[in-house]
């Protein structure tokens, strides 16, 4: 499991939030805005954005204080490996944008594909579906407008 230690040396087990909420809590980067994230937010319904830096986003999910972290920009393996382990052992999920488990040490440049971290795998899959559907729709729509002109 994943644990954190409070100031009084009390060890607490981390556990992701499994219950379905009416308002999805989405962790986003302060310094990496994304058009793909904006597209997801348009489709998701009621949500709350929580902005945090670096690996704290993973920790909020592992602690049950956030539901989804879509990372739709470049990262390196060393940026996410520890956070991935923390979320995984707290019961959460990290899937690449093509719905696969993240693999490490497969490329020379050590860059990750886009991914979604979530408290539940179904949330990650739903977010990925919305992101990829919206991306394909927008591409198709732009292409159709160009061809028609």
Stretch-by-stretch model annotation:
Residues 1-58, 110-149:
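Acidic beta-strand-loop-alpha-helix segment within the catalytic core
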């Amino acid at each position: 499991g994943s644990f954190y230690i409070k100031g009084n040396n009390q060890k607490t087990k981390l556990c992701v939030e499994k219950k379905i909420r009416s308002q999805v809590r989405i962790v986003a980067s302060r310094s990496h805005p994304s058009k793909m994230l904006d597209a997801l937010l348009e489709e998701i319904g009621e949500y709350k954005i929580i902005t945090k830096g670096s690996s704290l986003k993973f920790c909020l999910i592992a602690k049950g204080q956030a539901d989804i972290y879509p990372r739709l920009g470049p990262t390196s393996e060393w940026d996410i490996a520890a956070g991935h382990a923390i979320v995984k052992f707290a019961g959460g999920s990290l899937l690449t944008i093509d719905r696969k488990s993240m693999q490490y040490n497969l490329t020379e440049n050590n860059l990750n594909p886009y991914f979604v971290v979530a408290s539940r795998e179904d949330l990650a899959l739903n977010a990925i579906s919305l992101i990829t559907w919206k991306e394909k729709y927008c591409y198709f729509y732009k292409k159709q407008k160009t061809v028609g002109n």
